[in-house]
Amino acid sequence: MSKPRKKGRDINGIFLLDKSQGMSSNDIMQKVKRLFQANKAGHTGALDPLATGMLPICLGEATKFSQYLLDADKRYQVIAKLGERTDTSDADGQVVQKREVNIDLAKILTALEQFRGEIMQVPTMFSALKYQGKALYEYARAGITIEREARPISIFELKFIDYQIPYLTLEVHCSKGTYIRTLVDDLGEVLGCGAHVTRLRRIAVADYPYNKMMTLEQLQQFSEQEDLDLLDQHLLPMESAVIRLPGLHLTKEQARAVGFGQRIKFLNEQGIQGQVRLISPENLFLGVAVIDENSIVHPQRMVVIKPE
């Protein structure tokens, strides 16, 4: 007879993981979930096994707001090796082409101009994007190439950091859906020498502070103290995922109504429309709602806090 499954905790919050190289985002998310003994967890946009850096892990009710972090802009530091193109556009792939690197800094700075602002990008075959229910990387590993349409992305900032032939270091601030490997591969083709990613580190997601990140090893050390309250101190509030939305402060009666999923009308003197954070009279985060043109508040994603 199998043992009954151990019930997880109803813990809510966001853990800023500093992902190490080599692990998949899903594997490391499951480890974080177990260390917190959480009943539910989800990450907010996978990092390649080769990549390191910021990976927000949503626990409990915070998973309802993970999409906002998936959609958030992100910042990366990347080291590209010029002169070699690989099938995956990173160092985990096979080299498919080698070319001489005879590129000066002036040519690099000129080439970077083409990739700033609103641009179109064709997603890499080695991605988790789905085609007929299967991830593109599954087709790629089988030697099958699927036609992909170019998609609009935004490169808010593309900063030159360093160039020591053949290694080029850049910092990229970009919109959701941007593939840094593809950006580097495309840059290599513009330069005429080819390029691939050798190191990639995500240094920011939305407005989360870099210094709040913690590695899995550090989290394990706290876990070994068997003090869950101490562990929970390293969680950020789930409201932080939607902090860019305007806040709407409710009365006690309004808060009770939206808690039951009811729509409410309010005196909208500021003419607010669209998504808002709902705040209780006790200054507690209740969830996210949409205000329509008639100043009707429609609850969208509400927090459910179970009594202890």
UniProtKB/Swiss-Prot annotation:
Its EC number is 5.4.99.25. The keyword rRNA processing does not apply. GO terms for molecular function: RNA binding; tRNA pseudouridine(55) synthase activity. GO terms for biological process: mRNA pseudouridine synthesis; tRNA pseudouridine synthesis. It comes from the Bacteria. Belongs to the pseudouridine synthase TruB family. Type 1 subfamily. It catalyses: uridine(55) in tRNA = pseudouridine(55) in tRNA. Responsible for synthesis of pseudouridine from uracil-55 in the psi GC loop of transfer RNAs. InterPro entries: PsdUridine_synth_cat_dom_sf, PsdUridine_synth_N, PUA-like_sf, PUA_sf, tRNA_psdUridine_synth_TruB, tRNA_sdUridine_synth_fam1_C, TruB_C. This is tRNA pseudouridine synthase B. The active site is at residue 48. Pfam families: TruB-C_2, TruB_C_2, TruB_N. It is an enzyme of class 5 (isomerase). Keywords: Isomerase, tRNA processing. The keyword Magnesium does not apply.
